[in-house]
From Swiss-Prot:
Family matches, as InterPro entries: DUF167, YggU-like_sf
Protein name (database record): UPF0235 protein YggU
Assigned GO CC terms: cytoplasm
Organism, as annotated: Escherichia coli O127:H6 (strain E2348/69 / EPEC)
SUPFAM superfamilies for this protein: YggU-like
Xref: Gene3D superfamilies: YggU-like
Amino acid sequence: MSAVTINDDGLVLRLYIQPKASRDSIVGLHGDEVKVAITAPPVDGQANSHLVKFLGKQFRVAKSQVVIEKGELGRHKQIKIINPQQIPPEIAALLN
């Protein structure tokens, strides 16, 4: 399975998360996943909520349209973005 998949109702992203980074960013490919650096620590779900907020801004969707499908407690996550309004250039490059 590739890092980014398009299906009927949106995008499915396979992510590798780097918590406690100096800034939020979509870094690029990390093996067969997209590496995302976020500033939040991996404590009490802070990293997950920060990730959902960050991805919501990147894809211009509400936080409720960013769904963590797999990997709630780990660095390797599968996230669904429902009906993205915009696709960040780092992700668009992986779709080609």
